[in-house]
Amino acid sequence: MASWTTHERHYRYYDNCFLKRTLSPSEYQRDFRGQLHISLDNAARLANEAATLDFIGQETDIPVPRVIHAGEHSDGSYHLWTELVPGVPLKEIPLSDQHTVIEQIERYKSTLQGLRSSCIGGPTVAKQLQRDEMWITKHSPAKEYVFCHNDLSQSNVIVDPDTLEVNGIIDWEFAGFFPKCFDVPFYRSLKPPGAQIRSLADTCELEQFFSVLSVPEIGLRRGPTAVLVSDILNGMEDS
């Protein structure tokens, strides 16, 4: 059972499932200045991933891991248990065979973009923006926002190495309804997971989108997250 810990998460593989959880307060780590690293949107991102996996699994034919359990633990950490997806990451497939997989991803991406909303939803991918900024819950009279994975790298596409079939697309914590330009095709390169967060300069349309968020709109929310996917889905059901 492989396991590892980062500055904000603990991960563990079991025989048939996978655990991704936030660190409990007693596990918080210190940075080089000796200050505790506290990720304010950490649990919200996992809650968003759980809601997204349920939604995508119910509404599309895109292969995603089934959520076994998601919720807060008694020690203050947030746990997300999912089924284990068999296979290897796309980055381990020979370049000569990757076109077969990429064709499947493009079809799934088209399916995602068929899911639309008039409201932005999901944690922001621009983590380097100031945490104390006032964020706008941006609305549109037309359903112009499409569902985006927002971290569709080769590491997040799990493939059967024999059949080259996509067995699962994982790591949906940044997913939500956004402009099409948010879902950059990192699966066509070797950029690692989280590349979109670290490479905002690679996506100039995003900068233009964020620049208009200074205009007063319908509602304001403070902090690193906008609306969770579950909030939007509940609103869609009520309408």
Q: Residue ranges of each PLM-predicted region?
A:
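Phosphate/pyrophosphate-binding loops and the adjoining catalytic core of nucleotide-dependent enzymes
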Residues: 1-33, 112, 116-120, 146, ...
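ATP-binding pocket architecture of kinase catalytic cores
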Residues: 2-124
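Well-ordered beta-strand positions
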Residues: 11-12, 158-160
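Soluble or luminal CAZymes and related metallo-dependent hydrolases
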Residues: 44-48, 97-104, 140, 149, ...
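An alpha-helical support segment within catalytic cores of ATP-dependent transferases
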Residues: 72-73, 101-150, 160-165
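Short, surface-exposed, charged/polar-biased interaction segments
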Residues: 74, 88, 126, 133, ...
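Active-site Asp-x-Gly
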Residues: 142-148, 153, 160-218
